[in-house]
């Protein structure tokens, strides 16, 4: 699994700072495995982000906030639960054992520390609800119902990629696109972007990684929302582990919005 990271405007930030809060986010994976690592990003922010802990857990069939307690797995970073990511930087967790099933929804909960950027590194068009709770005096427990009662936003924060160990014969396709790829017109929390359908079809025959690197409003050359495709290509495509195929589905915003001729 992977997503394209972006600068977060004020309108896409939570109502309150992420400082001393817990944010539960949900991703829909393509294929499964038993060994993985998580990539976190602070690449679009100007201040460090302090993280107290990060843990994974299976959710139920509805892909919501609820987690199955026996599946909770805390990740480490160089052997420690807490980590600080500098501005403009990203990092991987230590490799961890976790039974990940093909096509499942996985919760990733980040417990933030005191220091968080004014503008987080995010992906605006998650088409999936994230659940944020206050934790000033304590860290919210995995099964805490306050996740359901807390603030809800349809964005991902600080998530970049989830790498699953597999053999070299497993194909992985990355998709570079704009809003059509990002999920415009799909149903929030239903995991029905066209790349989700592609993943389902491909994985019906064999394990097949499908990485959605779409950004709504994105352009190829210049303008649009977030960094244009030509600028983000190295990070978002070449920077992904195991990719051996590429779909480029961009250009409509360049044609429709640009005053230049290319």
Regions from the language model: what does each represent?
Residues 170-195, 216-219:
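Catalytic nucleophile-elbow at a beta strand-turn-alpha helix junction centered on a G-D-S/GDSL motif
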Residues 199, 213-216:
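Aromatic-Pro/Gly-enriched surface loop or interdomain linker
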Residues 207-208, 255:
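Secondary-structure boundary/capping residues
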Residues 123, 157, 193, 221-223:
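Extended interaction regions within the primary functional domain
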Residues 1-176, 186-188, 204:
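N-terminal secretory targeting modules
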Residues 186, 215-262:
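Oxyanion-hole/transition-state-stabilizing segment in secreted/luminal serine hydrolases
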């Amino acid at each position: 699994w992977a997503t394209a990271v972006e600068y977060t405007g004020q309108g896409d930030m939570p109502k309150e700072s992420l400082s001393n809060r817990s944010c539960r986010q949900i991703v829909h994976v393509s294929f499964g495995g038993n060994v993985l690592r998580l990539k976190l990003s602070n690449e679009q922010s100007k201040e460090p982000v302090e993280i107290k802990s990060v843990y994974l857990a299976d959710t139920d069939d509805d892909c919501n906030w609820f987690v199955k307690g026996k599946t909770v797995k805390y990740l480490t970073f160089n052997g420690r639960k807490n980590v600080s990511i500098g501005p403009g930087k990203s990092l991987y967790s230590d490799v961890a054992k976790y039974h990940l099933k093909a096509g499942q929804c996985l919760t990733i909960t980040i417990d933030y520390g005191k220091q968080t950027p004014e503008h987080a590194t995010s992906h605006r068009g998650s088409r999936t609800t994230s659940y944020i709770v206050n934790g000033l005096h304590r860290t919210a427990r995995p099964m805490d119902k306050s996740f359901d009662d807390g603030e809800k936003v349809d964005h991902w924060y600080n998530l970049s990629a989830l790498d699953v160990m597999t053999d070299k014969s497993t194909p992985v396709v990355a998709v570079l696109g704009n809003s059509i790829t990002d999920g415009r017109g799909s149903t929030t929390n239903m995991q029905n972007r066209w790349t989700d359908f592609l993943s389902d079809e491909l994985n019906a025959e064999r394990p097949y990684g499908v990485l959605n690197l779409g950004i709504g409003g994105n352009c190829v050359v210049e303008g649009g929302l977030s960094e244009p495709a030509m600028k983000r290509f190295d990070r978002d495509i070449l920077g992904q582990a195991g990719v051996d195929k590429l779909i480029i589905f961009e250009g409509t915003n360049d044609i429709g919005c640009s005053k230049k001729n290319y």
